[in-house]
């Protein structure tokens, strides 16, 4: 946690769970809006590290929120080279459900709230990914109309309980340990080479 805490200029004695909000490099307007709709309650209960995206951010909105909530709200357009350290210090990660990002989060044993891209303009893989993690009790999932401010608050309330987060972490350990993704990838490559 140390490097991430120092990069984010957070006090090691921070007594609130750290919520890392990721919408991708371009951001996710839907996720940003859900955070803004619940911002007062969220900042009372979490320290929020918010990757707003390079496109969907508003410097005025961010400046006002930083002024209002101080160290409880830390916005970034994009977290570049230090993502691993920042992810390591998070207690909960709220993000889309792309395969790479959720498996990286799983390997680091971080409970997740997933808001997958869905609808006609997507392949549907994020919904499948999110539902898989939810079925393994490793994530809370908000899809379509269920991705609203009330359900987000309920999911975050669940994550405030140390026991709930700990149970999810145990399930993540089982999931990552059982699937051994690096071994599976290596086996697939070897099989492809050998024909």
Question: Where are these predicted regions, by residue range?
Answer:
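A short, well-ordered alpha-helix in the C-terminal region of glycosyltransferases
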Residues: 164-178
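Acidic donor-binding loop of glycosyltransferase active sites
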Residues: 88-103
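Short hydrophobic beta-strand element within catalytic cores of glycosyltransferases
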Residues: 95, 111-123
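C-terminal "capping" alpha-helix adjacent to the active site of nucleotide-linked donor transferases
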Residues: 136, 140-143, 147-164
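Conserved donor-binding/catalytic loop of nucleotide-activated donor transferases
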Residues: 88-90, 106-113
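C-terminal alpha-helical cap of glycosyltransferases
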Residues: 178-195
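Donor-nucleotide binding loops and adjacent catalytic segments primarily
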Residues: 5-92, 127-129, 142-151
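Acidic, glycine-centered active-site loop in nucleotide-sugar glycosyltransferases
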Residues: 109, 127-139
